[in-house]
């Protein structure tokens, strides 16, 4: 892409980045789960690193693009090489080597597995809908104008990074299941208030609060899989959950075409409410069911 500028290579690059991201998240989830005494802290720390990269990389690439578009593309390629080198040097043994070679499909019979998958589906749907549509919504409604509108995603990633670091190091969850219920309720409340925001300061503040409230949901839910965390289970849970990030933005777009963007964004309350339902169901599992599933 850097040498030719061919658009077909750009499309191929997006596809390969998607494959690489999914594979990296799957592999890192297994490694962190197998090598962390506290899975919730480990997952939040891992996702903090992800948020840090998502927050800083756009500024780095934008700076390179001011020099040359090709430089920005080559820089992305260089970062990909660095990622490959990191995996090459990362010790992969740990506890994984002690596991049996036979694939264990028992997680498919676990109610907890499917409840957590549903929870992650709603989390991905709600988060990516805001990430994908909020700039357009703010500009279209006139709430946030100019260059500030382009930095709404930066606000979200900043809030996400702060929240995950606080969970990992300052305020660790004593009861992750109850914490997920609190996060689900608060992020739903903040989203409803965000939809009613009519000024720039209120919109930015509520967007920060929404992202902050939701930040710990994904890593905490994945960590709650406990003993079910394996290459096979994550290969089903994470892609199934990620489909929410594809489906919900499409639903919002279809509704927006017919009833306006405000109505489309209001549809995002559905996965937010889904977060509450699934988190409550996970929390209501008895300790015996939770350990057995």
Which residue ranges define each predicted feature?
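C-terminal ends and interior cores of transmembrane alpha-helices
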Residues: 1-5, 186-198
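Extracytoplasmic gate region of multi-pass secondary transporters
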Residues: 111-162
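C-terminal membrane-cytosol helix-exit motif in multi-pass small-molecule transporters
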Residues: 62, 72, 77-97, 278-283
């Amino acid at each position: 892409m850097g040498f030719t500028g061919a658009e077909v290579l750009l499309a191929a690059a997006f596809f390969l980045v998607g494959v690489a991201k999914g594979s990296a998240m799957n592999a890192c989830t297994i490694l962190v789960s197998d090598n962390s005494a506290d899975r919730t802290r480990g997952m939040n720390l891992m996702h903090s690193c992800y948020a840090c990269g998502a927050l800083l990389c756009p500024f780095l690439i934008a700076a390179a693009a001011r020099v040359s578009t090709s430089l920005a593309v080559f820089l992305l390629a260089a970062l990909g090489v660095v990622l490959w080198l990191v995996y090459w040097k990362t010790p992969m043994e740990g506890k994984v080597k002690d596991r049996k070679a036979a694939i264990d499909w028992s997680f498919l019979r676990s109610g907890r597995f499917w409840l957590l998958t549903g929870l992650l589906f709603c989390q991905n749907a709600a988060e990516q809908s805001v990430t994908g549509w909020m700039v357009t919504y703010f500009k279209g409604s006139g709430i946030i104008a100019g260059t500030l509108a382009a930095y709404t995603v930066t606000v979200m990633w900043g809030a996400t990074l702060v929240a995950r670091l606080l969970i990992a190091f300052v305020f660790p969850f004593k009861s992750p299941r109850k914490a997920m219920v609190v996060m689900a309720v608060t992020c739903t409340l903040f989203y409803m208030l965000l939809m009613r925001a009519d000024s720039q300061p209120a919109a930015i503040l509520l967007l920060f609060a929404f992202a902050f409230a939701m930040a710990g949901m994904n890593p905490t839910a994945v960590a709650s899989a406990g003993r079910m965390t394996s290459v096979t289970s994550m290969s089903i849970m994470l892609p199934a959950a990620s489909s929410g990030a594809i489906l919900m933005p499409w639903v919002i777009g279809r509704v927006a075409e017919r009833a306006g963007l405000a109505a489309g964004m209001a549809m995002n309350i559905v996965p937010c409410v889904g977060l509450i339902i699934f988190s409550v169901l996970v929390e209501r599992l008895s300790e015996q069911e939770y350990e057995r599933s």
